[in-house]
Amino acid sequence: MLNKLDDYPIHQTPEPIAHPATSDRNVYDRTWFNGYANDGSYYFGIGMAIYPHRDILDCAFSVVEQGGRQHCFYGSRRAPLERTDMSVGPFRIEIIEPMKRVRVVLEDNKSGVSCDLTFSARTASIQEGRQTLWSGARRVMDATRFDQFGRWNGVVRHPDGEMKVSDDMCFGTKDRSWGVRRVGEPETGGAPVMPGGIFFLWAPLVWDDHISHAIFFDGPKGEALVREGIVAPLYKSEADVPGVEDGRDQRMATTRHRVTYVPGTRLASSAEIDLVDHDGQTRTIELEPVLKFQMKGLGYTHPEWGQGMWKGELETGGESFDPRQVDPLQPENIHVQQVVRAHDGARRGIGVLEQICIGPYAPSGFADYFDGAK
């Protein structure tokens, strides 16, 4: 099973590139983006992933404007052997220059959602620490992720109108990850799976001359499973980005978070993040949400278009809904990203706070799987 990439000296195992190093059914390789206006007036998300042992390639595009509906396109197909084929029906991703420039195209389709967008990097790529989570003796997540901050140009069309996207006001994050994590239909057979939960925060923020980033995975008592904070230079143009990686990145000694929730929900009304450097100096960043995006619009916990679920040789679909009217405690609605204003007392920024909290979480007073804040 050879493909074009086998002509390059990039192999990490004796197998061809199409053969993952693990036989775990949940192996995946994902490309993901967000984009948002610097005034919080809109947000869009993009995702595509291949699941080699499920033989599936799926994708999604979703957009919401302030005060409007969230519009979604979903696509799924049998995975191509050729890994450079990053297309699902009317949707495709074109890597124009690796680690610098990417084009995302969604041609006209029955969902009424389409786009032609180009992402241009403003930072080098930033590798997060390896993320490994366990359920009993089983490793249920083992992934590498890197992020890159940039700007967007292009156009988005949806059933309620058209958005011109320009790099003078549209920021965004590219997120590449690969490894193993739970996807697709629930597994059957064997002993019943012990109940588990998840607490996750992800906060990429853009400031005048730098970015900050914080990642958290917590256990049910608030114990730290993953903690990472990063500060890195932000460049004026793509041409200024020094290379694949930037030696000026600063890794924090640790990070802390405090989230205040809207009563009766698990949706943040405000949050604070502490970045603690190796000299013990703490930078506290306050976050104010201004726009909500439901991550089910990209397939996360979606009951019909969940990631890694077999839909057929090639299927596409779409939907529109008002994110202000969904039940915030339904399992499919708990995972969100919010566009947030950020300030640290001296500087102001803009960015995103991603959040998912399912199951008991003592620091916030959650005692059940889907109870809301008091």
Give the ranges of each region predicted by the language model.
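Structured soluble/peripheral alpha/beta segments that form catalytic or ligand/cofactor-binding pockets
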Residues: M1-K374
